[in-house]
Amino acid sequence: MIKWPWKAQEITQNEDWPWDDALAIPLLVNLTAQEQARLIALAERFLQQKRLVALQGFELDSLKSARIALIFCLPILELGIEWLDGFHEVLIYPAPFVVDDEWEDDIGLVHSQRVVQSGQSWQQGPIILNWLDILDSFDASGFNLIIHEVAHKLDMRNGDRASGIPFIPLRDVAGWEHDLHAAMNNIQDEIDLVGESAASIDAYAATDPAECFAVLSEYFFSAPELFAPRFPALWQRFCQFYRQDPSQRLRVSAAEGDYGEESEH
């Protein structure tokens, strides 16, 4: 088990988790009652298997922990808790954190600098998050730090490093790669036209295939209306991989809302 040289707060086990309150966020509002029940069951197992560790004075409570667990389990709702194997701890800073980053350039020189990170994940090792960006992950805006890092973990199940191609049947790999690169190019074209700040999809998606998969996974679950119509072929591949269709949930929820309004008249 990793020992960290600073004082940390761990969430205790056997909590009486406030699931009803934890579910009351825009990200989860379109789940059916059956999906919510299964998500809670997965989140309970997640909290039994993983340590949530608060760093640098940040304080966890049962509601924060329950919501974190629910979001962690949303991408694996139809895949199973075993898809989150490979790490045992979630480290949570109060805000984005500074790390020492090293990289090698084209001629072999190694460079290093201090950079601010929102989150990090590795194939073997903890997931590192920060509370400010977790808070921004509760809505349905297309941004979700937890889903982003979970997507990297799912991606890395297919090899030593994230490639943008998760563990899918071999026959589907070429098509997935083609559609993912087409999406990256389309996003880059929009960035070139309107600039990063005005792009409708986070510009980070154009960085490389691994980041494209992670960023579009955020949109898949939290803003399907921005993903599905723009990249319909890739959307279907995401639906097949995650075994979910958030766009369909959104349509059903909207239809039920319209029906309810008509019934009141």
From Swiss-Prot:
Cofactor binding notes: Binds 1 zinc ion per subunit.
Alphabetic keyword roster: Aminopeptidase, Cytoplasm, Hydrolase, Metal-binding, Metalloprotease, Protease, Zinc
UniProt key word Cytoplasm: yes
Cofactor(s) essential for the protein: Zn(2+)
Protein EC: 3.4.11.-
Residue sites binding Zn(2+) per the record: H111, H148, H152, E211
Residues spanning the signal sequence: none
One GO CC term, this protein: cytosol
GO molecular function: aminopeptidase activity; metallopeptidase activity; zinc ion binding
GO BP terms in the entry: proteolysis
PANTHER family, sorted: MTFA PEPTIDASE, PROTEIN MTFA
NCBIfam families referenced in this protein's UniProt entry, alphabetically: PRK15410.1
Family: Belongs to the MtfA family.
Complex and partners: Interacts with Mlc.
Protein name (database record): Mlc titration factor A
